[in-house]
UniProtKB/Swiss-Prot annotation:
It is an enzyme of class 2 (transferase). It comes from Agrobacterium fabrum (strain C58 / ATCC 33970). NCBIfam families: metA (TIGR01001). Signal peptide: none annotated. The lineage of its organism: Bacteria, Pseudomonadati, Pseudomonadota, Alphaproteobacteria, Hyphomicrobiales. This is Homoserine O-acetyltransferase. Keywords: Acyltransferase, Amino-acid biosynthesis, Cytoplasm, Methionine biosynthesis, Transferase. Belongs to the MetA family.
Amino acid sequence: MPIKIPDTLPAFETLVHEGVRVMTETAAIRQDIRPLQIGLLNLMPNKIKTEIQMARLVGASPLQVELSLIRIGGHRAKNTPEEHLLSFYQTWEEVRHRKFDGFIITGAPIELLDYEDVTYWNEMQQIFEWTQTNVHSTLNVCWGAMAAIYHFHGVPKYELKEKAFGVYRHRNLSPSSIYLNGFSDDFQVPVSRWTEVRRADIEKHPELEILMESDEMGVCLAHEKAGNRLYMFNHVEYDSTSLADEYFRDVNSGVPIKLPHDYFPHNDPELAPLNRWRSHAHLFFGNWINEIYQTTPYDPQAIGKLAA
């Protein structure tokens, strides 16, 4: 089954062109099934690009998914037209009465700030608490993952001496995990962050299981079974050119930046990078969506009650 998104959302045409099955709202009404309700709390400045990345992966599932775009209420996005936000987004306050089968919390370019110094930290704390009663499964990504694991477990983040930036080899630490079904023992993941969480701090919490790790970049993915939460500290959702876009943005702005590790062919930024993580990104999101489908209550109003 395809993903259901508004017909006029910019991601619609992009995904159709890529071969992702996208369903119009009119066609969705004709299908007598309950689509999975997935919320995307988009904290990134360029929201349209992030919408496409996430919708591409969520929409590749054989299940019908309805994606709701959500933003922080009091925060203005600098790189997304206000008209786009008004047309396609709701604030969290506007959806907090709803139940979601799955909920994605993205990263944000604020990782060098202390959590308490983030202008919308109070709302983030409320959202984290709300997910425990209104969301069946939460996928936290990059800064969203660091913030969530700090909120729920007090796991700190540490500033790196230089930006972790590039494509790095990772190991599958739990081949039997439902979220890593079909994964190779060794695979590659894009990394782009100024901070990290550390294995030693996570291991203090037996309820957390580390599923993916890199010898160079540390922990990539952790799972919390009791809270039905995933913490993805890197960027499997990235496009082929995402790291290049970040690199050239910094170069053009005069910001010191090294070439992304193992990304450009022959370390030549004039050559187009090859995407070596796409298949595992689809596997990961497909496994997550499938597990939601297998375990979420048919009655959305029962979400949160089973874990209570």
